[in-house]
Amino acid sequence: MTKPVVAIVGRPNVGKSTIFNRIVGERVSIVEDTPGVTRDRIYSSGEWLTHDFNVIDTGGIELTDAPFQTQIRAQAEIAIDEADVIIFMVNQREGLTQTDEMIAQMLYKTNKPVVLAVNKVDNPEMRTDIYDFYALGFGEPFPISGSHGLGLGDLLDEVANNFKDEEDDDYDEDTIKLSLIGRPNVGKSSLVNAILGEDRVIVSNIAGTTRDAIDTEYSYEDQDYVLIDTAGMRKKGKVYESTEKYSVLRALKAIERSNVVLVVLDAEEGIIEQDKRVAGYAHEEGKAVVIVVNKWDTLDKDSKTMKKFEDKIRQEFQFLDYAPIAFVSAKEKQRLRTLFPLIKEASENHKKRVQSSTLNEVITDAISMNPTPTDKGRRLKVFYATQVAVEPPTFVVFVNDAELMHFSYKRYLENQIRDAFGFEGTPIRIIPRKRN
């Protein structure tokens, strides 16, 4: 099930980024101790009461023909297009402006829920000065103060009231839900077409739960797959291709609905920072991952080329050290058969459970080989561990003091668990918890 997307829209300097940071709080920072992943602050996740959602901050829209403003407006339109609910922000101190009215006209055409937020209402006496904003035609304005955090509860209540109840994907539990992600022009579309043309049976094209997404069902060697949002991967256009910050919205929706994510790289162009950012989304969502190096046919190769490229990937994607790597050519339909065993194994490991007794034997042996650390004279004591979840496999380790388990020792225990049980293709989570 995908989380709703909330876009914050308005002219410059009305306080959009301040409200964005208020809503997402510390979630704007990266998952702790995840080296090598960068997170763009323009997009993050938020929580309100029982609701999880994604929120996107957009650039300020102005009445100008400046070239950069054309790009900002295009980016905002993409964010609006992908959003389920829009927060339209205005500024009480500056009053209603012509630009506000222009943005309102743009939002009328979307036929989407719009919640009007009047920012910089820093004390109750100022609430009487917001009535001019009724003229924008979006109903009751919600007075807020980004700098003081006032009024956010009422605003988010109204935002959440506009979330649609979305049903889970109606796919069999054994069906592997698969998405492809990667920066523009790495060959995702070609890979989709090549996969669907490789000894497959297409069952049907059906509408996914994500608005206007098309999923494609197919089978390979008695395993059913669903390729999530093939329409999104095939969607072209200079605006989407050139505004990567915003076009990731659709990719993130696909990731949320997937079991396994194929991170597609370009063998010819090599690895760039954007590749790591895109891959980081799949890792942070806890999805099983297979790294796919496409366009392998374009390289002049010798016996060492593949090993050198793999070493480079391991160096650049340290946070994905669990992910297997496949080298393929979608264009030439080379080595595509190597993908499916990796996808299937990653999916199985993503759902794997281990017995507590065997797990604790592994933990005990690990501690005997490498004793727990000390800090200021206090030694970490590990009492026992248990698996509490799958997708991804998640383990709680009960200890005397959770703060004594440093990242390096947590990583050591993870490696020992991997050595004992496998888990190739899936992240695993280890949560230290103080025993009561």
UniProtKB/Swiss-Prot annotation:
It comes from the Bacteria. GTP 1 binds at residues 10-17, 57-61, 119-122. GO terms for molecular function: GTP binding; ribosome binding. GTP 2 binds at residues 182-189, 229-233, 294-297. Keywords: GTP-binding, Nucleotide-binding, Repeat, Ribosome biogenesis. Residues 4-167, 176-351 form the EngA-type G domain. It holds the Pfam family MMR_HSR1. Gene3D superfamilies: 3.30.300.20, P-loop containing nucleotide triphosphate hydrolases (3.40.50.300). GO terms for biological process: ribosome biogenesis. Residues 352-436 form the KH-like domain. SUPFAM superfamilies: P-loop containing nucleoside triphosphate hydrolases (SSF52540). GTPase that plays an essential role in the late steps of ribosome biogenesis. Belongs to the TRAFAC class TrmE-Era-EngA-EngB-Septin-like GTPase superfamily. EngA (Der) GTPase family. HAMAP family: GTPase_Der. Associates with the 50S ribosomal subunit. This is GTPase Der. It comes from Staphylococcus carnosus (strain TM300). The gene is der.
